[in-house]
Amino acid sequence: MLFRSPDNSKSRGQYLPMLEMAVDEEPFNARNLYYYARELFFHKDYLAAKLVFEEYLKYTKYPGEKSYALRYLAKCDPHNAEKHLKESIKTLYCREGVLALANHYYITKEWKKCFKVSLEAMQIKTRLNDFMSEEWAYGPMAYDLAAISAWQLEQWDDALRYGEMALEMSPNDERFINNVKFYRSKVDELHLRSDGG
């Protein structure tokens, strides 16, 4: 399997006009549309990226790339983010997509959904065997989101348990260290009360 790495010695600025020209020459080429939309996204031209991603979705056949494009589209079109993220998961069920949805619920403060979807993400152990596999999805994020949402739902023991799991995966993360101290103090306080202390 070949993996392409960007040439960091060259400016990204040259890619956009080249991709635009490629799309002008072959407007139905899904691969060109995908890379053009992605480059527009990197240049923070979210409206243009949204339109090109929507065009790309009409022609693509590759589920991995389509799922990834839908996650980009969710960022370009935040009012419809949940719809795009659910479609991404339906297109290709993977930890990256499920965690993106959990993170959306974290951003929108939908704590029950965030907790449920974070737990679902934890169950996905198999990594994608292509360039769509992303390291961050297999780190502490699912456990951190579960801990935060459990805290918001006043599920103190769950907050501590998942907070400790996040910390175990990233033991030097200051936020995780502080969160676990915070969660533990709440759990200890409740246990003291229940013991009549």
Language-model features: where?
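Residues that mark the junctions of alpha-helical repeat units in TPR/alpha-solenoid scaffolds
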Residues: 29, 33, 66, 94, ...
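Structural register within alpha-helical repeat arrays
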Residues: 36, 72-73, 101, 146, ...
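Residue at a conserved register position within TPR or TPR-like alpha-solenoid repeats
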Residues: 40, 70-73, 77, 105, ...
